[in-house]
């Protein structure tokens, strides 16, 4: 039985693509191990899939003060020693890094022990960990073309959940719909405050011309409820702290307004759901560049956060109808040609053949 260690943690954007790859390999008879940290969400998510998870002590560099930054080299040495013990014990045939700081110690040790190392970068702009490890890999897999500029790079897309890939094509979902446009507003699991305070006002102006399904997060729930309730008797809306079944929400929607995380962008492109992206203003603007290809093919629009306001959204929505959205949807879906999980699985099998 062949063995793989998947290194991923910290955010769902690293973890869930790794889990889809893990499920594919398990179905082919592989034994999958996971390398993460005990303090982050991978410690709660990964064991639910029956995958053995091993822990190292490591944290990221963002938001650290000078004293904490000075301690990082020592912590990295400790984490590398922990990763060394884990890799020696498991003796994997290959190691896969999904990005994020947790993949760095294992990546370093895999190189020193001459274990095949491959990485997957979900974003259009590569993260620091993958930039570092890309110099020591057998293959660099990337969701977007020209992200990691080496001869070892292969564009494979992002691994998507089966609940997403099983959805009907967008024009089959809403071609025969009538009535108000169905608009899904998603600000991430924590909500997005600029969305939360904008869309009650949008509902007030557009009233029954739209239907809103708004994921508001857990902050200020009562305030947001009151904002929607005030003067919005004619508006049609549903608000919830968190949407557990995002596939159901995608199926319902004609249009989504959201951030531009890598997985969200890939899911939207695959199912053909027209989008208005409001990229989070990271320093490297990676969310903008995630969304940019969809804008260029005519399947999405981008509003930078500094330009985002009620009037801009209302103007955009007034200029949209289902006929225009169907055209956008077809452009999105026809542009997605990658079978990511199948391709990644084959790459792993070929390297370890």
UniProtKB/Swiss-Prot annotation:
Location, primary (coarse class): membrane
Compartmental location: Cell membrane
GO cellular component, as recorded: plasma membrane
Coiled-coil portions: none
Pathway membership, UniProt: Cell wall biogenesis; peptidoglycan biosynthesis
Listed NCBIfam families: murG
Protein name: UDP-N-acetylglucosamine--N-acetylmuramyl-(pentapeptide) pyrophosphoryl-undecaprenol N-acetylglucosamine transferase
């Amino acid at each position: 039985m062949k063995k793989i260690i998947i290194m991923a943690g910290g955010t769902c954007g690293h973890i869930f693509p790794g889990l889809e790859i893990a499920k594919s390999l398990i179905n082919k008879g592989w034994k999958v191990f996971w390398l993460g940290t005990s303090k982050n969400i991978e410690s709660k998510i990964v064991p639910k899939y029956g995958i053995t998870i091993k822990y190292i002590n490591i944290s990221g560099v963002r938001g650290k003060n000078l004293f904490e930054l000075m301690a990082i080299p020592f912590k990295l040495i400790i984490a590398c020693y922990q990763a060394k013990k884990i890799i020696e014990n498991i003796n994997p045939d290959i190691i896969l890094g999904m990005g994020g700081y947790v993949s760095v110690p294992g990546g370093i040790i895999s190189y020193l022990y001459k274990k095949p190392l491959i990485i997957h970068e979900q974003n259009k702009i590569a993260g620091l960990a993958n930039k570092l490890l890309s110099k020591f890999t057998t293959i660099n897999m990337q969701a977007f073309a020209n992200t990691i500029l080496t001869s070892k790079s292969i564009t494979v897309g992002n691994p998507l959940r089966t609940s997403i890939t099983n959805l009907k094509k967008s024009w089959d979902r809403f071609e025969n719909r009538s009535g108000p446009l169905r608009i899904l507003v998603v600000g991430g699991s924590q909500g997005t405050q600029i969305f939360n305070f904008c869309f009650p006002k949008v509902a007030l102006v557009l009233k029954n011309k739209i239907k809103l399904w708004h994921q508001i997060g857990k902050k200020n729930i009562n305030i947001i409820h009151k904002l929607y309730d005030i003067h919005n008797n004619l508006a049609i809306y549903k608000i919830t702290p968190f949407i557990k079944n995002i596939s159901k929400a995608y199926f319902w929607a004609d249009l989504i307004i959201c951030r531009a995380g890598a997985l969200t962008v890939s899911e939207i492109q695959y199912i053909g759901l027209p989008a208005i992206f409001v990229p989070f203003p990271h320093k490297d603007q990676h969310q903008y560049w995630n969304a940019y290809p969809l804008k260029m093919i005519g399947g999405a629009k981008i509003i930078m956060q500094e330009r985002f306001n009620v009037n801009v959204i209302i103007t955009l929505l007034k200029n949209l109808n289902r006929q225009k959205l169907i055209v956008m949807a077809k452009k999105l879906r026809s542009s997605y040609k990658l079978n990511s999980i199948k391709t990644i699985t084959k790459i792993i099998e070929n390297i370890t053949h």
